[in-house]
């Protein structure tokens, strides 16, 4: 367990990176994140977060549904207190490609 905590701490100490985030609400996000620790507390600044949800396709395969995390806002950055985060990991290159492709599609749809 200690190695998991130290791995999470290393990820959280990076300046800015593309992450998969699981919130206590159950939401799963992909976003560029910056970890902040200052007099206001510990929090993440998420930039262009998208919510990802697993869905079953008609052919019985799993697919992904993506949507803006904050559907009624044109803001690009949001603050999430770290106590609202279950876990956070840096994504693979394949997920990064999926994120950027999804973000481009969402930006043209809205």
Sequence positions of predicted segments:
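Conserved RNA-binding domains used in RNP assembly and mRNA/RNA metabolism
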Residues: 2-110
């Amino acid at each position: 367990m200690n190695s998991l905590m130290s791995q999470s701490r290393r990820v959280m100490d990076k300046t800015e990176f593309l992450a998969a985030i699981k919130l206590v609400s159950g939401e799963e996000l992909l976003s560029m994140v910056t970890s902040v620790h200052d007099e206001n507390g510990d929090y993440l600044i998420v930039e262009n977060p998208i919510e990802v949800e697993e869905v079953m396709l008609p052919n019985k395969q799993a697919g992904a549904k993506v949507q803006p995390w904050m559907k009624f806002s044109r803001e690009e950055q949001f603050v999430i207190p770290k106590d609202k985060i279950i876990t956070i990991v840096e994504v693979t290159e394949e997920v990064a490609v999926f994120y950027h492709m999804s973000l481009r599609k969402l930006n043209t749809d809205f």
